[in-house]
A protein has these predicted regions:
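Extended two-metal-dependent nuclease catalytic cores across DNA- and RNA-processing enzymes
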Residues: 2-8, 72, 76, 100-102, ...
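Noncatalytic, basic helical substrate-engagement surface that gates or grips nucleic-acid strands
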Residues: 2-168, 174, 185-189, 193-194
């Protein structure tokens, strides 16, 4: 996939006003993780007794699983780290939206359901359990910024965010996850704000999508893509290794990356050399998991993806 420095920084007009659509799951999660790295001291309201736990998650585990802890709720204690987490999120969000070019902003958070989980029960199964603070922070953000927050239903926050931003004439996407760069538009990476706002054109976005169709998203979402390299691919394209990772995917697409039709043909050929007669089913499966549409409730279709490609290819 392209790196941030490959994109166009001249399309963005700093003198105009934009609406920033923020895929905020990472922003929220990171604040919850930071808090959970430190000890958590709590004070019981009635007795005044204090107790220190290794982390906030350990405190919640005590309340939910220990026979003594089950007698209490969080409300029975003064828990300073909760306030710290709220303050940290507020400060982080302020740094993101405190830009002269931002007229308004919307925060997108992931809800409880996601169609990808129905298609693939192992979706995100490689992730560690979320820190307990995430739920408290999620509820707080939904209350504190209720006029700004939108929670996704049966999709990722990034699906909701992208579709809304793409249909906003002054929309710009605030993001971290590279999955969102598979569509064309204005982007602002809130972990690299010094880079500024950049534009991804349609060919670059399609190339990013094709890369993901090959290598999936193993480390983050447990989407394996093509997790092996067949003998036929090694012989035809001169690549090695045990599986198609991001570097191999980029190498396989390098000579066709400036032509959408040629990229389609290349992806199809690699799937055919990997899966034989079942190549379409496998491409449909991976595409359904990695594709993020600019249209609400539109999903990946291998037949639509292959439009324009000679059926004999």
């Amino acid at each position: 996939m392209y790196s941030i420095d490959d994109y166009n920084f001249s399309v963005f007009d700093p003198n105009k006003k934009y609406h920033l659509h923020i895929d905020a799951d990472t922003l929220l999660f990171s604040r919850a993780v930071v808090i959970d790295n430190d000890p958590c001291t709590v004070k019981h309201h009635k007795s005044g007794r204090k107790k220190t736990f290794d982390s906030f998650s350990d405190f919640i585990h005590f309340l939910e699983n220990d026979e003594k802890g089950k007698k209490f709720t969080v409300k029975d204690f003064d828990v300073p780290v909760i306030g710290f987490a709220f303050s940290n999120f507020n400060d982080s969000l302020k740094r993101v939206v405190d830009q002269n070019w931002i007229e308004d902003y919307t925060i997108y958070l992931g809800g409880a359901t996601n169609f990808r989980k129905d298609l693939y029960p192992q979706y995100k199964a490689n992730r560690k359990k979320s820190p307990a603070m995430r739920k408290f922070l999620f509820d707080y953000v939904c209350w504190k910024y209720k006029e700004k927050v939108k929670v996704s239903v049966n999709e990722e926050a990034e699906d909701f965010c992208l579709a809304q931003a793409m249909n906003d004439p002054i929309g710009c996407i605030g993001f971290v996850d590279k999955d969102l760069t598979t569509q064309s538009g204005l982007f602002f990476n809130y972990q690299k704000m010094d880079k500024g706002v950049f534009f991804i054109n349609k060919i670059q976005a399609f190339y990013n999508l094709c890369c993901q169709l090959l290598h999936g998203d193993r480390s983050t979402d447990n989407i394996v893509g093509i997790n092996f390299i067949s003998k036929e691919i090694k012989e035809k394209y001169g690549v090695g290794g045990k599986s198609i990772g991001e570097a191999t995917a980029m190498k396989l697409l390098d000579d066709v990356k400036h032509d959408k039709l040629l990229m389609k043909e290349r992806v199809a050929d690699i799937y055919k050399l990997s899966y034989g007669e079942s190549w379409k089913d496998n491409l449909q499966f991976t595409g359904s998991l990695v594709f993020i549409s600019k249209i609400k409730d539109e999903y990946f279709s291998v037949d639509k993806f292959m439009r324009g490609v000679d059926s004999g290819q």
